[in-house]
Amino acid sequence: MSEETPASSADAPVPPKKRGVPEGLWLKCPGCGSSVYKKEVEQRLNVCPKCDHHFYVSAKDRIAQVLDEGTFEPMGESLRPVDPLEFSDRRKYADRLVGEQKRTGLTDAAMTGVGMIRARRVAFAVTDSAFIMGSMGSVVGERLTRLIERATDDGLPLIIISASGGGARMHEGILSLMQMAKVSAALARYDESGGLFISVLTNPTMGGVAASFASLGDLVFAEPKALIGFAGPRTIKATIGIELPEGFQTSEFLLEHGYVDRIVTRKNLKSEIARAIDYCGK
């Protein structure tokens, strides 16, 4: 009687592959902690279907959400950031710019231009926190200034949606800080001409952006639960050693204290802007 030959690994039955859920179909909401279907969130303008948390939205998507389809005429696209200080921290600023441009598809942290909102012609700008935290350097400041001057010359309502957690861009030193004054001065001339400036604050709006143009609107709208302020809560506590009220930099707190005029959900933003333009006779 012959001995049995042990089965080789090649002869062993192959267990069926587990059919897992493809990656990227679900998101975890930072507002309520629920797992939510990504496609459903996108259909609701990147808002959680369970708690109405407002997720990040890119500058390009903001344009698609707020402006009438196909009406956006970009301005200042030829302007490109440079590295006049040859700045370097963990990475050379010049290399960082190239990396951010490839990653986001943007040339800098702001998109500006002219478009229509419910058939009303407006000057429109939006910053994007994905590009170096939406910080304001020379190009962002110049694009905004040229847009404001265009709005002044053409008598257009001005809409700026801010999503800037980085404030003035430290990589450009004083050249970025001066943009705060330059943009604010352009807004002062626009105001003297009788223009209507609607500033929309989203999460986050911080630093030099919050301390300049974002706070200068004739009307200041904010998305729900947006973080708005100059320095972050931990920085303030470490600097002055005082425990500040919980949520003191949220849009709801700022509405109660008169800094924000109205909290507007994303789905209502377009209609609220159009209504404000009509109400103000612009």
Sequence positions of predicted segments:
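Conserved catalytic cores of soluble enzyme domains
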Residues: 165-281
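Short cysteine-rich clusters marking metal-coordination/redox-active sites
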Residues: 29-32, 48-51
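Long, charge-rich boundary regions
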Residues: 56-134
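Residues immediately within or flanking Cys/His clusters that coordinate Zn2+
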Residues: 26, 45
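N-terminal alpha-helical interaction blocks
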Residues: 1-17
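N-terminal targeting/trafficking signals and adjacent low-complexity tails
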Residues: 19-22
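Cys/His-rich microdomains that often coordinate metals
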Residues: 35-36, 54-55
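Cleft-lining beta-strand/loop regions that shape enzyme active-site pockets
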Residues: 108-191, 198
